[in-house]
From Swiss-Prot:
This is Delta(24)-sterol reductase. The chain crosses the membrane at residues 25-45. Belongs to the DIMINUTO family. Residues 548-567 are annotated as: Disordered. Highly expressed in the apical region and root tips and lower levels in immature and mature internodes and leaves. Changing S360W: In strain: cv. Torsdag. One of its GO terms (biological process) is steroid metabolic process. Residues 45-231 form the FAD-binding PCMH-type domain. Its EC number is 1.3.1.72. Induction: Not induced by brassinolide.
Length: 567
């Protein structure tokens, strides 16, 4: 939307928080970045130390830590100790929610020791990992073996547990689905302290399908077995500029990975990686990647771009150059490609450090980047948090592929946020209805990208300050999110709950399906022990009444029954 087309809004009167946010870069440079670098280095040393340990030692430590969690759960007094949650501080999580449920009465269980890669099974092509293993840690181990998780979320600090209990996506999700779709087994400690292993075809198959998106409210995840795939040393990346309106961009994006003849499972026609970045209502760059060998990448005439070096142009800005120079192809080392958005936090780094993209800063201080999201959250008080909720948007909309154009037009009209990130993912038709699910009958009228067993969706990632805020105008962030959520419910979309949500409980369960989740809450004793997923996601501090009602929930509550997965 151009400035002439933008709706007239009154100017917003500046308050003291505006000036603090404007000059927050001082705190970031002199405090947050040095501490972040130190923490990254210490974490790296801990990871290396763990890798040196034998499988037997790591498994022994894992078993001991599991027993500690079991013992801790058994010490809980339901009448006075509160509902169970992890002992992680509210600011540690990468998500944008305030984790307000930890500001009320609760019973903490420490899962911090669960950060080891337990085994890489090359024969079964499975990685067995603990929940606090992060993406940077796992790729450092697997990529030298020419292996990788089927879905590697871009940011280094994202953990396996968060990607399973919450939400995780990457440019390969148009082939493999969301991160949780690549998990073959969950190891869960239930409310009674029992340790169970849930797979899609054992006695805990209902729990297996209910865990994703449950936010840790069915049990405590202590390990997971995740699919590995073979990879090559480089990613051959093609940058294709697109100029047109938002519907044109949406169609070009769809065409970049979804054959119009419906042959979606043909690897010859479908690239290994896909993403599109939209820089304005009329300009975008579609990127497609295919794994390539070292020999191919180093052939005469091919360009290799080591995007991981600290002084390199931030990736989203590098991709934007395609709009000036036209289509081009280059080869990026695979691990550097996986984490291409880490150093600049997509484009959020530009707001945190307005001059951070300048060559002089990148060359002198780029090695300190990125600031840890947890430290950014730890150094902001209540007023700053509320300011960001009102004046800044970090939201993902999971939208059916054929509705992406509509979603882009809605976002442009209501928020005016650019760049926008597009990343496709399969939403599988499972043997049992889960919290998120494809549209009924999609397989009978398959649209572009759909297959017989999966509907193609897209993550429309909206991360930045809205246009009205950048122009100094009045903007109601909470109301904008409420409108977004209403549009999503009407259009069979889903909102990842790492973000700030304005949904009330009724609308939350209009967006998500409660059947299997509530069935497993009752069956496995989570009610009255673990918080409900809405309780955890609800915005705002919990009142004493809300805490008491959640604690006193009992197992004879009327939950909807669901069909069990077929044997």
């Amino acid at each position: 939307m151009s400035d002439l087309e933008a709706p007239l809004r009154p100017k917003r009167k500046k308050i003291w928080v505006d000036y603090f946010v404007k000059f927050r870069w001082i705190l970031v440079i002199f405090v947050v970045l040095p501490i972040s670098f130190t923490l990254y280095f210490l974490t790296y040393l801990g990871d290396v130390r763990s890798e040196w340990k034998s499988f037997k030692t790591r498994q022994k430590e894992h078993d001991e830590n599991v027993q500690k969690v079991v013992n801790r759960l058994k010490k809980r007094n339901p009448s006075k100790d509160g509902l169970v949650c992890t002992a992680r501080k509210p600011w540690v999580a990468v998500g944008m929610r305030n984790v307000d449920y930890k500001r009320a009465r609760h019973f903490e269980v420490d899962l911090s020791p669960f950060r080891n890669i337990l085994d890489i099974d090359k024969e079964r092509m499975i990685a067995r990992v603990e929940p606090l293993v992060n993406m940077g840690q796992i790729t450092r181990v697997t990529v030298p073996m020419n292996l990788a998780l089927a879905v590697v979320a871009e940011l280094d600090d994202l953990t396996v547990g968060g990607l399973i209990n919450g939400y995780g996506i990457e440019g390969s999700s148009h082939k493999y689905g969301l991160f949780s779709d690549t998990v073959v087994a969950f190891e869960i400690i239930l409310a009674d302290g029992s340790l169970v292993k849930a797979t899609k075809d054992n006695e805990y198959s209902d729990l297996f399908y209910a865990i994703p998106w449950s936010q840790g409210t069915l049990g405590l995840l202590v390990a997971a077995e995740v699919k590995l795939i073979p990879i090559k040393e480089y990613m051959k990346l093609t940058y294709k500029p697109v100029v047109g309106n938002l519907k044109d961009i949406a169609q070009a994006y769809s065409d970049s990975f979804a054959p119009r003849d419906g042959d979606q499972d043909n690897d010859e026609k479908v690239p290994d990686f896909v993403e599109t970045m939209i820089y304005s209502p009329t300009r975008a760059v579609c990127m497609t990647g295919r794994y390539a060998s070292k020999e191919e990448a180093k052939k005469k005439g091919n360009k290799i771009n080591n995007v991981g070096w600290w002084y390199k142009t931030w990736f989203y800005q590098h991709a934007e150059t395609a709009l000036k120079k036209g289509l081009f192809v280059e080869y990026i080392p695979t691990r550097e490609y996986y984490h291409r958005h880490t150093r600049c936090l997509y484009w959020e780094g530009k707001l945190i450090l307005p001059f951070g993209d300048q060559f002089s800063f990148r060359f002198l201080f780029g090695w300190l980047m990125p600031p840890k999201v947890s430290l950014l959250k730890a150094t902001q008080g209540e007023a700053i948090r509320n300011y960001y909720h009102e004046m800044h948007v970090i939201q993902d909309m999971l939208v059916p592929l054929y509705k992406v154009g509509d979603a882009l037009e809605w976002s442009d009209r209501e928020m005016e946020i650019y760049p926008i990130w597009l990343c496709p993912h399969k939403l599988f038709k499972l043997p049992i209805k889960t919290m998120i699910y494809p549209e009924a009958g999609f397989e009978l009228q398959r649209r572009q990208g759909d297959t017989q067993n999966a509907q193609m969706f897209t993550d429309v990632g909206v991360y930045y300050a809205p246009g009205p805020v950048l122009r100094g105008e009045v903007f109601d962030g909470a109301e904008a999110v409420r409108k977004m959520e209403s549009w999503m419910i009407e259009n069979h979309c889903f909102q990842p709950q790492y973000a700030v949500s304005e949904l009330n409980e009724k609308n939350f369960w209009r967006m998500f399906d409660a059947g299997l989740y509530e069935h497993c809450r009752r069956k496995y004793g989570a009610v009255g022990t673990f918080m409900s997923v809405y309780y955890k996601c609800k915005k705002g501090r919990k009142t004493e009444k809300e805490v008491r009602e959640a604690e006193q929930a009992h197992l004879d509550t009327a939950y909807p029954e669901v069909d069990q997965p077929p044997d």
